[in-house]
Amino acid sequence: MALVTLAVTTPAFAAKRSIMELPLFERAVLIIKKFETLHKPRHWPYVGYGHQVQPGEHYRRGCQLTEAQADALLRKDLAKFCALYSQYGKDSVLLGALAYNCGPGVVNKSTVLKKLKRGDRNIFKSYTSHCRYKGKWHKGLYNRRLTEIAALFVP
């Protein structure tokens, strides 16, 4: 399994620390920021750290969120996804992070969720199988899944 080595230098955690010293939710935020990066106006309809603009939202084409705005939006979205899976306790953040990237529809039909429902904790292969974009396997998505499962999965 991959060793997670993200340096944490946010204002809340001023000294450099290992990501593994942080709460699960904060780990997920850092991982998403690392892999999504702050989207530019050309990435429309995505803003911030991968938020897909929904009908009725006040974002307009060509807008660029500040880091603070993007961070707040990421935390709001991730909290919403984690809440969808709150009945899974310690796994809610892992499932929320997957839903943030793939969507809750994909997670709800996934082998990962089915295994966790029946108490099977052997989810590595199932979790890391979510590495396709437009039908093609992507190494970047695989690395993201390795990082997520290493930092967010509590055996």
Where are these regions (language model features)?
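Long, amphipathic, charge-rich alpha-helical segments that form helical bundles/coiled-coils
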Residues: 92-106
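Short, His- and charge-rich active-site/binding loops that engage polyanionic ligands
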Residues: 45
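Bacterial N-terminal signal peptides
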Residues: 1-7
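Long, amphipathic alpha-helical surface segments
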Residues: 10-41, 51-87, 105-155
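Short, highly charged
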Residues: 48
